[in-house]
From Swiss-Prot:
UniProt name for this protein: Putative speedy protein E7
InterPro entries: Speedy (IPR020984)
Superkingdom per UniProt: Eukaryota
Family recorded in the similarity comment: Belongs to the Speedy/Ringo family.
Gene Ontology terms for molecular function: protein kinase binding
Classification via Pfam families: Spy1
Organism: Homo sapiens (Human)
Length: 208
């Protein structure tokens, strides 16, 4: 796919950068009662408006548009997983203009890796990007598929792209200081930035 070549080159050529700092914790006044003050510890978010802007820009990408429309069951792209993409953008530490289509899928894959116990959703990302992979072939057909794959240059190319995707996923994960967990409070904060955004209507619970 055309999206891969440009994104792959830009990500491979990125210079070594300082890892994004971890969010600090501050004490804020929650309640005043006479001379008494109740303090509550709150984590300072590192998500900036520019990270939301990068996310919104990528939503206009034709490949991402097709992917979101393709995921009708919201198995890999419900509102919480998409909110995690924005958080990951803030943690990776890249300038907002450098985020491209490949970064969206890397972040979304990591979000699924973190939140979903089922392996199928992550495989669906590969299925969309590269077509049917070995993991989605029934067991009795695997030997035949292995033979065809050896004879099919396109199948070998798809396999190598998946391997490269996993390599880039690990690099992206390291750029976030290996911090993939996102708290419920952070997810609420992301959605509260623009509560009317159409992606927050992608609620998997409403489909069940």
């Amino acid at each position: 796919m055309e999206w891969w070549d440009k994104s792959e080159e830009s990500l491979e050529e990125e210079p070594r950068k300082v890892l994004a700092p971890e969010p600090e914790e501050i004490w804020v006044a929650e309640m005043l009662c006479g001379l008494k003050m109740k303090l509550k510890r709150r984590r300072v978010s590192l998500v900036l408006p520019e990270h939301h802007e990068a996310f919104n820009r990528l939503l206009e990408d034709p490949v991402i548009k097709r992917f979101l429309a393709w995921d009708k069951g919201l198995r890999v792209s419900d509102k919480y997983l998409l909110a995690m993409v924005i958080v990951y953008f803030s943690r990776a530490g890249l300038p907002s203009w450098q985020y491209q289509c490949i970064h969206f899928f890397l972040a979304l894959y990591l979000a699924n890796d973190m939140e979903e116990d089922d392996e199928d959703p992550k495989q669906n990302i590969f299925y969309f990007l590269y077509g049917k992979t070995r993991s989605r072939i029934p067991l009795l057909r695997k030997r035949r598929f292995q033979l065809c794959r050896c004879m099919n240059p396109r199948a070998r190319k798809n396999r190598s792209q998946i391997v490269l995707f996993q390599k880039l996923r690990f690099q992206f994960f390291c750029s976030m200081s290996c911090r993939a967990w996102v708290s419920p409070e952070e997810l609420e904060e992301i959605q509260a930035y623009d509560p009317e955004h159409w992606v927050w209507a992608r609620d998997r619970a409403r489909l069940s």
